[in-house]
Structures are given as structure tokens and as C-alpha cells.
């Protein structure tokens, strides 16, 4: 939660700097966002490489539960595609690109800003932060009315880090491994799906 608020604070600060012309306009035309993206991808790779225990724990998973991240991805993209039908100013592929962030707001918003512009990038940032917040605050409700796998699916890419504690508390310790596996797979899919969906239009 704290990390999400910090990200939003920087967004607001940047908006104010741009609105009052405190930063030269040429600054936004630089390749700074591209280099930031490269740095972020490097950090993602380090985090995966530094945690071999996570990869080993996947072997003990129930084979049927391995389909959960696939269902999360398909369900999210299907819902975004339907939402795009009712949005006259946005294509379904735009909406799907935003949804393909799966709560990974830092990476997806940079990708989308780079490919589609700052407006859609901002929408991606806010919508993916909201997904994380909903998973954090709504986990008890989701478990009560939709089952113990519900907060894992809603958490998207965040279930192996920020939302893991609340999922463990609400769903039980037996769901820790599937939560980590789910977050790992969905997290890994983000750069590929976002890039692909930004490159097409329908």
C-alpha cells in the first residue's frame, strides 16, 4: 500500500511540474523512460535469479492449480476486451494492454507510455494500482464470497510479493506456494503481453 501511494505521489508531482513548466519540454522527448525500463527489467531478472527457492517450490504444486495463472490472464484480457467495446475513444487492444499489467503498474505503465503515449500510460498506472489495492483491502471479502483462490487471481502479478501476506492470512498458509507460482507466471507474462497488445489495434 505504501509503495502504491509513493508511486501516485510521484505521478502527481510530475503532473504539477509539467503543468507549471518547471521542467523543459525537451526532457519528455528524451529516452529516459526507455533507460528506466531497461533498468527495471534488469532488476526483475536479478530478483528471479536471487531466489532459487521459489523455482524449486513449484515442483510441489498440484498440477490442476498450475492453470490458475492462465485463467487469470485469459479472464482479465476477456473482461478488458468487453470493456473496450463500450469505450468509444479507446480500442479493445488498448484496454487489454492496460489490463495486461495485472497489477504490475511500474513496468506496464512505462511500456504503455513508450508505445501508446502518456495518457494511456497514466490510465495503466492508476488502474493497476487500483487492482493491487482491491486485492489488499478486499481479500477477506473475496475469500468469503468467492473462495480462497479469488484473492490470488485478483492480485495478478502482485501475489508473489506485496499481496502475499494478506493472501496467506485470508486464504491460509497452504496457498503460499500457488500464490508465489501464480505471481511469478503472471509477472513474467507482463512485458510480452503488453508489448504485443500495444503493437496491434482492433
Segments from the language model and where they lie:
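Juxtamembrane helix-boundary/capping and inter-helix hinge elements in multi-pass membrane proteins
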Residues: 1, 22, 48-55, 61-65, ...
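Helical membrane-embedded segments and adjacent short helical loop/helix-boundary regions
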Residues: 1-76, 92-103
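Alpha-helical membrane segments and immediately flanking helix-loop junctions
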Residues: 93-133, 148-181
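Entry/N-cap segments of selected transmembrane alpha helices
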Residues: 52-80, 121-133, 178-186
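Juxtamembrane boundary at the C-terminal end of a transmembrane helix
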Residues: 192-202
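Transmembrane alpha-helices that form the ion-translocation and gating core
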Residues: 66-112, 130-146
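Hydrophobic transmembrane alpha-helices of multi-pass small-molecule transporters
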Residues: 38, 135-136, 163, 191
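Small-residue-rich transmembrane alpha-helices that serve as helix-helix interface/gating elements
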Residues: 37-39, 183-190
